[in-house]
Amino acid sequence: EQANVLDLYSGTGSFGLECVSRQATEVVFIEKEKKAIKILEKNIEKLKIKKETKIFSGDVFYIIKKNDKTFFDWRPDMKFDLIFCDPPFNDTNINDLIELIITRDLLKKKGIIILHRHKNTKEKLTIYFKVIDKKIYGLSKIIFGKLLPSSP
């Protein structure tokens, strides 16, 4: 409740839309697939939650790393309580994504990052990410974590 949520690789937005239904203050979606964005836009319209949501169309790294004007001008000091990261299962740069979140200072001090990975993914997560819980659902592994205070 009352959370600012960033949904990276949001697809059709099921996670972020669920957050709005649970009283999130604002959900920001970043997705590059045009078909997924069209479905997301229709869902937002049907649910009448346009004022609680914002969609950015494009590559996550481009939008955040390149200091995309539309993203950072929209809410210059925006920090998120919850960041959901659902990159394609074959995407191996999850640590780059975590480090980008750190570099851009997107997570609030007590914020949580949720990673959605394939259950068989064996990756060594950056030392700046502390796993606080893991769940397996079918082929999915959900990892809940926090950034350590010593993050660069």
Predicted segments, located by residue:
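Class I S-adenosyl-L-methionine-dependent methyltransferase catalytic core
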Residues: 1-152
